[in-house]
């Protein structure tokens, strides 16, 4: 909102503190209508979402500011976490008036209210909040030998050729069963820990590693057992220990909303010798699933019959996953993991997530719990329920899909103002601890490869074409230039930079399974990797990039710039996402200025820095 404005929640003249408020904290609101409007009264109109209560607080006259009259009030945030929606009401002595909401003055209709998040303060583990995450799809990262899948759950087979495409064509029944494996292993990951450390990695987030019939392993067969194609529990303990020696923690993927139909729990095909819920109503797991009636009709995740949905409220299931002394969450943390990422957090009840958080922190004092949420997690509605993910007792933070969406929109031709607005909305809505612990990324196992997205115009229409698609030299050159910009934003923006395996060496691919190819050992784009490693090193070195706040300096057209500062250190990021030269000027009251990426030095003139950025060029100034 540009000057002059009546109320802007991001302006300290109108609201302090910025953004979310801690339970019980005092929040100061000030409105500044033009005196010529004739308003003599102003009220703050609140609605507390979880309490279901409304409140109207009259603001007191607070003098004049030029041609504006000021109204102010100090509001004490509730003692319990809450989501508050608010707008203002103005009226004159003659009784006439109007409301003020995010769109401006209005005299009718439902106000489009501002949001105030009220949260209970909690601490994010420092190893995560100031680190860099590397996401691995375990089957596709590194294999040391070709394993034999004979005798394992599921009709699995292993590619002999590491460089082949994953299978994507449906079988004769029209199903893509994901039974083709490449043989990546935990020992393979261990063998590359030094290279990951050189990249700046401080945490490994691994897609599921427990026994499963599918290569993605999101249909768990046995939570107590490492999938034999990956290794065993001793390999896992060794991975965690050796990673920690290099300053790297391990984050596991918790898939607790559903299991696999081929699992020790459901056992639809009778592979396991014990009785599963699909075989007998006397199974110890029978109350984990909902049948309509037993055994052929049952609840499944999104109706996919190979993914029977779990009843999270089944007492024995809660004890097995969370509450028990040797629960799944606790036992794998004791085995060496440092945290969990909850798959499909929207599908899990809030009380379940709260219990999981408690178990994580009981098992490991600096344990981490993050969640897969694709939208703004502060006000998410899932299955008609407003969620409380970030209010202090559930998740430490979430995967920041809004960051990826907004950044890619900007890099692919959108206005920089949209990137800024999307990120400022998240900063305003999230508790600061959660905002600065956002898992920021350019791609995951659920998105197309970042280089492909940036280099190509549109995806080919047919899956056949997408399977064989490769960027042309011209497309790859443009995509690489934009990838460098995207990586610069990733490593310099508040949050935890997260790299999906292979993005740092120029892997390509559209949607699943083409985004889950094997790591191209010996064929890496080393120039891209060196650039990522440089950025990872700079983040480790510079306090401002790990802890600094953010202030936007420019966000217009194809140019974005922001500054982060901490303990007297400043880092300025400037991004030109356009295909032509851009100029940028800023105050720089210091003697010298260096682009920390290229080493190029700039000399301020009369305290002003005048920069020329070429097409698709970015700078990190310090």
Language model segments and positions:
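Carbohydrate-interacting/catalytic domains
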Residues: 1-137, 141-143, 149-153, 159-163, ...
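Hydrophobic faces of well-ordered beta-strands that scaffold small-molecule active sites
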Residues: 132-134, 204-206, 250-252, 340, ...
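Substrate-binding/active-site clefts of carbohydrate-active enzymes
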Residues: 137-202, 209-335, 356-362, 379
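Aromatic/acidic polysaccharide-binding cleft in carbohydrate-active enzymes
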Residues: 139, 383-384, 436-471, 487-526
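Short, solvent-exposed loop/turn segments at secondary-structure junctions
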Residues: 139-142, 210-212, 256-257, 333, ...
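Conserved residues at the C-terminal ends of beta-strands
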Residues: 207, 226, 343, 348, ...
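Active-site-proximal helices and loops of the catalytic beta/alpha 8
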Residues: 240-249, 257-258, 263-274, 328-330, ...
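Aromatic-anchored helix/helix-loop segment that forms the rim or "lid"
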Residues: 420, 424, 460-481
């Amino acid at each position: 909102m540009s000057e002059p404005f009546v109320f802007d929640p991001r302006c300290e003249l109108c609201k302090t503190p910025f953004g979310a408020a801690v339970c019980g904290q005092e929040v100061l609101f000030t409105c500044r209508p033009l005196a010529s409007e004739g308003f003599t009264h102003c009220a703050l109109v609140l609605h507390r979402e979880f309490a279901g209560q409304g409140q109207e607080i009259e603001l007191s006259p607070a003098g004049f500011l030029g041609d504006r009259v000021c109204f102010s009030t100090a509001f004490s945030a509730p003692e319990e976490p809450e989501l508050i929606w608010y707008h203002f009401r103005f009226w004159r002595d003659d009784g006439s008036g109007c409301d003020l909401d995010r769109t401006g003055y209005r005299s009718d209709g439902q106000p489009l209210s501002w949001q105030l998040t009220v949260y209970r303060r909690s601490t994010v583990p420092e190893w995560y909040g100031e680190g860099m995450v590397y996401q691995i799809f375990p089957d596709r990262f590194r294999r040391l030998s070709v394993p034999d899948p004979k005798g394992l759950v599921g009709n699995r087979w292993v590619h002999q050729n590491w460089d082949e495409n994953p299978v994507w064509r449906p079988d004769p029944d029209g199903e893509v069963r994901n039974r083709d494996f490449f043989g990546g292993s935990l020992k393979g990951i261990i063998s590359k820990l030094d290279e990951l450390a050189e990249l700046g990695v401080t945490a490994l987030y691994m897609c599921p590693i427990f026994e499963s019939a599918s290569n993605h392993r999101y249909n768990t067969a046995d939570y107590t057992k490492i999938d034999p194609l990956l290794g065993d529990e001793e390999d896992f303990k060794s991975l965690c220990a050796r990673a920690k020696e290099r300053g790297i923690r391990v984050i596991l993927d918790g898939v607790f909303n559903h299991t696999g139909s081929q699992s020790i729990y459901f056992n639809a095909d009778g592979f396991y010798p014990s009785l599963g819920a699909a075989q007998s109503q006397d199974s110890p797991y029978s109350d984990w699933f909902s049948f309509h009636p037993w055994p052929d009709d049952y609840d499944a995740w999104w109706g996919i019959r190979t993914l029977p949905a779990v009843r999270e409220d089944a007492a024995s299931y809660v004890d097995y996953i969370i509450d028990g002394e040797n629960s799944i969450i606790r036992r794998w943390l004791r085995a060496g993991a440092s945290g969990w990422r909850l798959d499909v957090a929207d599908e899990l009840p809030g009380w379940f997530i709260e219990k999981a958080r408690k178990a994580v922190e009981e098992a490991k004092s600096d344990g981490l719990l993050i969640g897969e949420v694709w939208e703004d997690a502060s006000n998410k509605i899932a299955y008609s329920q407003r969620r409380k993910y970030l209010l202090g007792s559930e998740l430490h933070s979430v995967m920041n899909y809004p960051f990826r969406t907004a950044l890619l929109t900007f890099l692919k031709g959108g206005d920089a103002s949209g990137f800024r607005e999307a990120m400022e909305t998240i900063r305003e809505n999230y508790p600061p601890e959660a905002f600065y612990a956002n898992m920021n990324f350019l791609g995951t196992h659920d998105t197309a490869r970042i280089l492909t997205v940036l280099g190509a115009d549109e995806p080919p229409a047919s899956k056949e074409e997408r399977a064989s698609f490769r960027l042309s030299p011209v497309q790859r050159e443009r995509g690489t230039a934009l990838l460098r910009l995207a990586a610069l934003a990733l490593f310099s923006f508040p949050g935890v930079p997260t790299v999906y395996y292979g993005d740092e060496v120029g892997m390509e691919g559209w949607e699943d399974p083409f985004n889950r190819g094997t790591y191209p050992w010996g064929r890496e784009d080393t120039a891209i990797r060196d650039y990522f490693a440089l950025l990872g090193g700079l983040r480790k070195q510079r306090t401002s990039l790990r802890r600094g706040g953010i202030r936007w300096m420019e966000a217009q057209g194809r140019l974005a710039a922001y500054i982060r500062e901490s303990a007297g250190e400043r880092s300025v990021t400037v991004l030109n996402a356009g295909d032509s030269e851009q100029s940028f000027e800023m105050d720089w009251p210091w003697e010298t200025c260096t682009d920390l990426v290229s080493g190029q030095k700039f000399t301020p003139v009369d305290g002003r820095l005048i920069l020329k950025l070429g097409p698709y060029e970015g700078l990190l100034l310090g």
